[in-house]
Swiss-Prot record:
Involved in high-affinity nitrate transport. Acts as a dual component transporter with NTR3.1. The lineage of its organism: Eukaryota, Viridiplantae, Streptophyta, Embryophyta, Tracheophyta. One of its GO terms (cellular component) is membrane. Expressed in roots and shoots. It comes from Arabidopsis thaliana (Mouse-ear cress). Residues 501-539 are annotated as: Disordered. This is High affinity nitrate transporter 2.3. It is a multi-pass membrane protein. The chain crosses the membrane at residues 76-96, 112-132, 137-157, 166-186, 190-210, 233-253, 289-309, 324-344, 359-379, 384-404, 418-438, 448-468. It is found in: Membrane. Belongs to the major facilitator superfamily. Nitrate/nitrite porter (TC 2.A.1.8) family. It comes from the Eukaryota. Pfam families: MFS_1. Its main location: membrane.
Length: 539
């Protein structure tokens, strides 16, 4: 008899149904003890499949299931709301400058101020996440900065305008809590995509506000308010959104997959760390500072663009206020796809090439985006300028997504503070580029854009120096030292021998075990031992 083994009939392992873990197995038991074991399974309480740290191995953006997907949605929506507030003034600058008699220098300094405050708040947020949890950090940032958003309605001059924009910018610290929250909720194999979606959809608030604020301004004006009164009333909208999100985060959020940080610390399930130790291991790791520079030349540029792009199209191409807002909004709206794409590309590259693939992906996206930034500044017609802006936005935002496919692996113990330092790099880069290129009459806005692109190309080069002994770098292979080439050694080195004896490092060891996928498929397959019969053990 001839047997026809087709793909439709089965695949390798079908003769051992239920053994290979590739098939669905149907079974039931009437034994009470077996039912008890199933109900006691610690992973049974999760809606998504999880790893040994109870971090989700699947990403389902259409779900709001607790705790993983709920934390994801609360994180990005909080950041989205804060982005709207921070850049709410930018599309209304043509009206505000006439009302407050602002000069180009005043507007430029206010733009610098709007992102400079977050340099400090993001550093603080990193420590808050490590020590208190992402839920409190996010909610405090939203609620404490909401009054400053309302205060914009009562500004009377240039100094008040600058001061209020500086204080509103503190809320951008929610980016750090957002990325930290998703990093502790999702497995490393999908962290690039998840962080890309969370950060990208949050960044999209910079585009939405370019549409929202002119629309709200127009509606209020139609209701009978004067232009100089309408822009002031409009700021009650983003302030109200922050209050609502703060309440939702406190009432619905959860710090970690197994519960809130304070509760787990009291029960002894999670150790309570010291700020001095967390801070030390973050600042002494040179990779942290390279990420600081890299994010300053990707996210920093994006923040700068949010402040200048609407006015650039309004003045250079004589567009109407609402039209300029629509064009400018397209830059920020690209985050919906571009940043998640960058994170997903990082994950895909890691599956084959490991961490080295993530680093190459980051360098390619960031360099290409910077080159299109140069082109944007040299564009002489509206269609070419819009095309250059869109290509620039895709490259730069994809680079941001790819960068946070790397950042979660720099440290386990100081994850929050490293996220904070990296995020602060974005604000520092934005403040620096606005100060250098857009705060005086030395350069036109077009010249400033091109020079900013050149600066970004140069600042992307240090990615080549990021080297992990267990995974290698862009040009160098992993360490040949047997002990140092292990993930457990890298993450365990952040703990002293005394701390290890107390078992405080166990979370880092679990993280190390789940990070072996960063070796890449080729390395992983090469390391699988071959038994005497010559058949690889993974087949």
């Amino acid at each position: 008899m001839t047997h026809n083994h087709s793909n439709e009939e089965g695949s390798i392992g079908t003769s051992l149904h239920g053994v290979t873990a590739r098939e669905q197995v149907f079974s039931f038991s009437v034994d009470a003890s077996s039912q008890t074991v199933q109900s006691d399974d610690p992973t049974a309480k999760f809606a998504l499949p999880v790893d040994s740290e109870h971090r989700a191995k699947v990403f389902n953006p259409l779900s709001f299931a607790k705790p993983h997907m709920r934390a994801f949605h609360l994180g990005w929506l909080s950041f989205f709301t804060c982005f709207i507030s921070t850049f709410a003034a930018a599309p209304l600058v043509p009206i505000i400058r006439d009302n407050l008699d602002l000069t180009k220098t005043d507007i430029g300094n206010a733009g610098v101020a709007s992102v400079s405050g977050a340099i400090f708040s993001r550093l603080a947020m990193g420590a808050v996440c490590d020590l208190l949890g992402a839920r409190y950090g996010t909610a405090f940032s939203l609620m404490l900065t909401a009054p400053t958003v309302f205060s914009m309605s009562f500004v009377g001059g240039p100094s008040g305008y600058l001061g209020v924009r500086f204080m509103i910018g503190f809320c951008l610290a929610t980016f750090v809590s957002c990325q930290y929250w998703t990093s502790v909720m999702f497995n490393g194999k999908i962290i690039g995509l998840v962080n890309g979606c969370a950060g990208g959809w949050g960044d999209m608030g910079g585009g939405v506000t370019q549409l929202l604020m002119p629309m709200v301004f127009h509606v209020i004006k139609l209701a009978g308010a004067t232009p100089f009164m309408a822009w002031r009333i409009a700021f009650f909208v983003p302030g109200f959104l922050q209050v609502v999100m703060g309440i939702l985060v406190l009432s619905l959020g959860q710090d970690l997959p197994d519960g809130n940080l304070s509760t787990l610390q009291k029960s002894g399930q999670v150790s309570k760390d010291k700020f001095s130790k967390v801070f030390w291991f973050a600042v002494k790791n040179y990779r942290t500072w390279i990420l600081f520079v890299l994010y300053g030349s990707s996210m920093g540029i994006e923040l700068t663009i949010n402040n200048v792009i609407s006015g650039y199209f309004y003045d250079r191409f004589n567009l109407k206020l609402q039209t300029a807002g629509i064009v400018a909004a397209s830059f920020g709206m690209a985050n919906f796809i571009a940043r998640p794409f960058g994170g997903y590309a990082s994950d895909v590259a890691a599956r084959v090439f490991g961490m080295r693939g993530r680093l190459w992906t980051l360098w390619i996206f960031q360099t290409v985006g910077a080159l299109f930034c140069i082109w944007l500044g040299r564009a002489s017609s509206l269609p070419i300028a819009i095309l250059a802006m869109m290509l620039f936005s895709i490259g730069t935002q994809a680079a941001c997504g790819a960068l946070f496919g790397v950042a979660p692996f720099v440290s386990r113990r100081s994850l929050g503070l490293i996220s904070g330092l990296t995020g602060a790099g974005g604000n520092f880069g934005s403040g620096l580029t606005q100060l250098l290129f857009f705060s005086s009459a030395r350069f036109s806005t077009a010249e400033g854009l091109s020079l900013m692109g050149v600066m970004a190309v140069l600042c992307t080069l240090p990615v080549a120096f990021i080297h992990f002994p267990q995974w290698g770098s862009m040009f160098l292979r992993p360490s040949t030292d047997g002990e140092r080439s292990q993930e457990e050694y890298y993450y365990g080195s952040e703990w002293t021998e005394n701390e290890k004896q107390q078992g405080l490092h166990e979370g880092s060891i679990k993280f190390a075990e789940n990070s072996r996928s960063e070796r890449g498929r080729k390395v992983a397959l090469a390391n699988i031992p071959t038994p005497e019969n010559g058949t690889p053990s993974h087949v």
